[in-house]
Amino acid sequence: MARRLIRPRRWDPPRLADSGATAELSVSRRLPTGGVGPEDVVFDHAGRVVAGLAGGRVVRIDPASGERAVLAETGGRPLGLHPRADGGVLVCDHDKGLLEVGVDGSVTRLVDVAFPSNVVEASDGTIWFTTSTTRWTLDEYLGDVFEHSCTGRLMRRAPDGTVTTVLDGLKFANGLVLAPDESHLLVAETAGYRIQRHWPSGRTEVFADNLPGFPDNMWLGSDGLVWVAIVAPRNALLDRLLPLPGFLRLLVWNLPQAVQPKAAPIASVMAFTLDGRLVHDLRTAGGSYGFVTSVAERDGLVVLGSLTESDVAVLGNSHA
């Protein structure tokens, strides 16, 4: 079956720089989810892990005992999550839009939107969320990376339900963090190898640029650090193709998948201070846990999620 036609946009990516010393990313144990693909993992206010799975289930796992409960069935594909103080969860569902899961397991659609990716909520009830692309689906995400469509958005849902686009033209908008004082947000641009800082007043600046890979979901840990999942390292062939005439990417896109650029099997997470200083750069090559799409930290415990794995991984490194 022929692949969808891409509309390549030229972009000159920054030359990959050496990020300096890295530490080994070591998985000490796994927490079974009872399903596949815990794409985003977060801690609720009681310290339990919450994850969304392929097939629509949102599950809660006690990281000490492994005890598991199903919070809700969305009927779609849950991606980014945000735990609410009352025990409910905001869910970015690829198929259903931005959802609210109540403590009773009820599911309510708040915004009918395609490919919502991550979400945070302010103390006044304002909800901020990203949409990754208006051109492609989750199953076709590589098309957006190849095309560089720049159709990602940061959006805002006001307490009265009004929805507005705050930023557009983003390079596959993804992870989202709200600063502790709620003065600004951090937005990951997966296909732009960077994280932007945005003030609701309208100012936007680069928080972290020229990352060694594709940043995915993010989490503000109890340690005050911004934890970032790097879903895959940058690909040298793709970086060479992006600034060249688009027909070259068209040619490569239509080649057999076996000869196209592929993600290297490297698991990676990074952690930054709120002023953008890199504190942790954890990597492992060819490890037992791959395609890391999310990371969360609470009281020194660091967990990972993945679009393809069946379990939530618990790191053995001490980050307290």
State what each model feature region is.
Residues 1-320:
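Sequence-structural signature of mature extracellular/luminal beta-sheet repeat domains
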